[in-house]
Amino acid sequence: EFGSYVYLGEMITNIPFPPDSPIEDRCGSCNICVDSCPTGALVQGGQLDSKKCIAFLTQTKGFLPDEYRGKIGNRLYGCDTCQLVCPENKGKDFHIHSEMEPDPEIAKPKLKPLLHISNREFKEKFGHIAGSWRGKKPIQRNAIIALAHYKDRTALPDLIKLMHEDSRPIIRGTAAWAIGRIGDQSVLFELEKALEKEQDEEVKNEIVKGIEMLKA
C-alpha cells in the first residue's frame, strides 16, 4: 500500500497477536536500486554494505573517505536514492499525516549559515528531527562537502575562517579540502599558512590535499 515509505518501530506488549504473513519478494530480476546506488552499497540478493551507504556515511563523525565525498554530493543527512528509483514506490501516496511533513527550510536548509551555527541554535532549529541525533558536527562537515560539490566561491571566506579557527580537526580538515576544490591560486597562501601552524596530522593531510588540488 505504501511501498517502502514507512517508519519502522516496535511496541512492547503482553497482548498476544497472530503473526503476520511474510511479505512476498516482488523484486524478481529488477536491479534498478542496485544499479542506481551512488556508492555501490547495494548488492544482489537484497544485501547492504552499510559502510558504503550514504545514509550511514552522512551520520559518521570522522573524516569521510575521499572516494565517497564526491558521491555524497549535496546530501546533508541520509539518502533515499534506492527508494526513489524503486518501481514499487511509483505512484504511492505517502503524504498521509500533515504533521509529519518536513518544513522545507529544515529539510533543505541554506548551507553557509550551517557553518557557524551555535549549539543552541542548532538544537532550537533541528533538535526535533532525526538528523540531529548525532549533533551538529556531521551536518556541518556534510555542508562543507556540499559547498565543495557546488564549487560555491562565495563560501571561501567562511571556509578559510573555519580552517584557521575552528577547534574541531574534522571541520578544519574538511574545510581545507573544500578550499582546494573550490579555490584557485589566490587562496593557496591560506592553505600554506594553515599547514605551517597545524598540529593535527589528519588535518595536515587534508591541507596537503587542498594544496595539491590547487597546484594541479
UniProtKB/Swiss-Prot annotation:
<keyword id="KW-0408">Iron</keyword>
<feature type="binding site">
    <location>
        <position position="33"/>
    </location>
    <ligand>
        <name>[4Fe-4S] cluster 1</name>
    </ligand>
</feature>
<feature type="binding site">
    <location>
        <position position="86"/>
    </location>
    <ligand>
        <name>[4Fe-4S] cluster 1</name>
    </ligand>
</feature>
<dbReference type="InterPro" id="IPR017896">
    <property type="entry name" value="4Fe4S_Fe-S-bd"/>
</dbReference>
<keyword id="KW-0411">Iron-sulfur</keyword>
<dbReference type="GO" id="GO:0051539">
    <property type="term" value="F:4 iron, 4 sulfur cluster binding"/>
</dbReference>
<dbReference type="GO" id="GO:0008033">
    <property type="term" value="P:tRNA processing"/>
</dbReference>
<feature type="binding site">
    <location>
        <position position="79"/>
    </location>
    <ligand>
        <name>[4Fe-4S] cluster 2</name>
    </ligand>
</feature>
<feature type="binding site">
    <location>
        <position position="82"/>
    </location>
    <ligand>
        <name>[4Fe-4S] cluster 2</name>
    </ligand>
</feature>
<dbReference type="Pfam" id="PF13484">
    <property type="entry name" value="Fer4_16"/>
</dbReference>
<feature type="binding site">
    <location>
        <position position="30"/>
    </location>
    <ligand>
        <name>[4Fe-4S] cluster 1</name>
    </ligand>
</feature>
<dbReference type="Pfam" id="PF13646">
    <property type="entry name" value="HEAT_2"/>
</dbReference>
<dbReference type="InterPro" id="IPR017900">
    <property type="entry name" value="4Fe4S_Fe_S_CS"/>
</dbReference>
<protein>
    <recommendedName>
        <fullName>Uncharacterized protein in gldA 3'region</fullName>
    </recommendedName>
</protein>
<feature type="domain" description="4Fe-4S ferredoxin-type">
    <location>
        <begin position="18"/>
        <end position="47"/>
    </location>
</feature>
<feature type="binding site">
    <location>
        <position position="27"/>
    </location>
    <ligand>
        <name>[4Fe-4S] cluster 1</name>
    </ligand>
</feature>
<keyword id="KW-0004">4Fe-4S</keyword>
<keyword id="KW-0479">Metal-binding</keyword>
<dbReference type="GO" id="GO:0008616">
    <property type="term" value="P:queuosine biosynthetic process"/>
</dbReference>
<dbReference type="InterPro" id="IPR016024">
    <property type="entry name" value="ARM-type_fold"/>
</dbReference>
<dbReference type="InterPro" id="IPR004155">
    <property type="entry name" value="PBS_lyase_HEAT"/>
</dbReference>
<dbReference type="GO" id="GO:0052693">
    <property type="term" value="F:epoxyqueuosine reductase activity"/>
</dbReference>
<dbReference type="InterPro" id="IPR004453">
    <property type="entry name" value="QueG"/>
</dbReference>
<feature type="binding site">
    <location>
        <position position="37"/>
    </location>
    <ligand>
        <name>[4Fe-4S] cluster 2</name>
    </ligand>
</feature>
<dbReference type="GO" id="GO:0046872">
    <property type="term" value="F:metal ion binding"/>
</dbReference>
<dbReference type="InterPro" id="IPR011989">
    <property type="entry name" value="ARM-like"/>
</dbReference>
